[in-house]
């Protein structure tokens, strides 16, 4: 039962993390006021 709970929490946090990361990563692209996005600094 503990393994099931751990696996469920892992999957939930995994998808929540991906959703939050994708939302925060795509958020500046929706704001046309950000001019620094045109010159990516890797």
Swiss-Prot record:
Might you name a Gene Ontology BP term for this protein? photosynthesis
Q: Does the keyword Transmembrane helix apply?
A: yes
Q: Where in the cell is it found?
A: Cellular thylakoid membrane
Gene Ontology cellular component list: photosystem II reaction center; plasma membrane-derived thylakoid membrane
Report the transmembrane regions from the record: 6-26
**InterPro entries, per database record:** PSII_PsbI, PSII_PsbI_sf
Keywords, alphabetical: Membrane, Photosynthesis, Photosystem II, Reaction center, Thylakoid, Transmembrane, Transmembrane helix
User: Matching Pfam families, A to Z?
Assistant: PsbI
What is the recorded membrane topology of this protein? Single-pass membrane protein
Keyword Membrane recorded: yes
SUPFAM superfamilies per the record? Photosystem II reaction center protein I, PsbI
Q: Which family does it belong to?
A: Belongs to the PsbI family.
Q: What does this protein do?
A: One of the components of the core complex of photosystem II (PSII), required for its stability and/or assembly. PSII is a light-driven water:plastoquinone oxidoreductase that uses light energy to abstract electrons from H(2)O, generating O(2) and a proton gradient subsequently used for ATP formation. It consists of a core antenna complex that captures photons, and an electron transfer chain that converts photonic excitation into a charge separation.
Record PANTHER family: PHOTOSYSTEM II REACTION CENTER PROTEIN I
State whether it acts alone or in a complex, and with which partners, per the record.
PSII is composed of 1 copy each of membrane proteins PsbA, PsbB, PsbC, PsbD, PsbE, PsbF, PsbH, PsbI, PsbJ, PsbK, PsbL, PsbM, PsbT, PsbX, PsbY, Psb30/Ycf12, peripheral proteins PsbO, CyanoQ (PsbQ), PsbU, PsbV and a large number of cofactors. It forms dimeric complexes.
Q: Which HAMAP family match?
A: PSII_PsbI
The protein, known as: Photosystem II reaction center protein I
Upper classification of the source organism reads: Bacteria, Bacillati, Cyanobacteriota, Cyanophyceae, Synechococcales
């Amino acid at each position: 039962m503990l393994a099931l709970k751990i696996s469920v929490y892992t999957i939930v946090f995994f998808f929540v993390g991906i959703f939050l990361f994708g939302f925060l990563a795509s958020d500046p692209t929706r704001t046309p006021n950000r001019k620094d996005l045109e010159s990516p600094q890797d």
